[in-house]
């Protein structure tokens, strides 16, 4: 059975056909509409899936935000242009006339990355550092989603009580500092207004402020990982996302994590499936009907 997998992120929408063998075919992307209107997202999703839906027997969605009762509830609306709520399962069911499931994108990615691990690992945490910061937790070989879908939203734990206000309403969240959006928001002077990709490029060229912003992000993430180790005693942490997979970033995180007491150290791995983990994880969960 072929699954039409969809990944809804703060920057881009992706879709692909995924067979029972886990092979990804006909992958395509569109920019995520920066609009508060549900119609804009519906139209973009329609354009994305229309060339693919005839070749699939079901739909699996991995989306940013809390997924509850098949709907997207934005914990940080800024990541979706201000959109607060969107009926994912209902909308894709109407667009495709196919059975549809939905799960948080980081939870989906965690499940895919867990399947790729070698050895006797039963407990792992996946962290995505991208437009926002999200996560997924596998404990005892089972994916934790929580009764309300909130499990794994580790980007909204505290990094700095005097830090910037996060889009979720809290102050000093990890996401507000370590994410691509957080890195860009802290830029000043000639870097003001630059996006995270530009800041990473400037850091590679030796720009001191750009390097400081990236180090700040990596340091915050390392402290988060130490907290996660203390909370879950996980055997490894897998890092993905456009920032998490940026050249040199994970090495910085490892350097800062090494400065923590040894009890809080944990193996760090780069995401095996890179930017396709959410798509694949959603399809795997649909195949296993675990949602």
Curated annotation (Swiss-Prot):
GO biological process terms, semicolon-separated: N-acetylneuraminate catabolic process
Pfam short name (any one): ROK
Stored InterPro entries: ATPase_NBD, ManNAc_kinase_bac, ROK, ROK_cs
Keyword Chloroplast in annotation: no
Signal sequence, start to end: none
Residues that bind ATP: 5-12, 132-139
Domain of life from the UniProt record: Bacteria
Statement: the UniProt record of this protein carries the keyword ATP-binding: yes
Record-linked PROSITE patterns: ROK
Free-text function comment from the UniProt entry: Catalyzes the phosphorylation of N-acetylmannosamine (ManNAc) to ManNAc-6-P.
Protein name: N-acetylmannosamine kinase
Gene symbol of the encoding locus: nanK
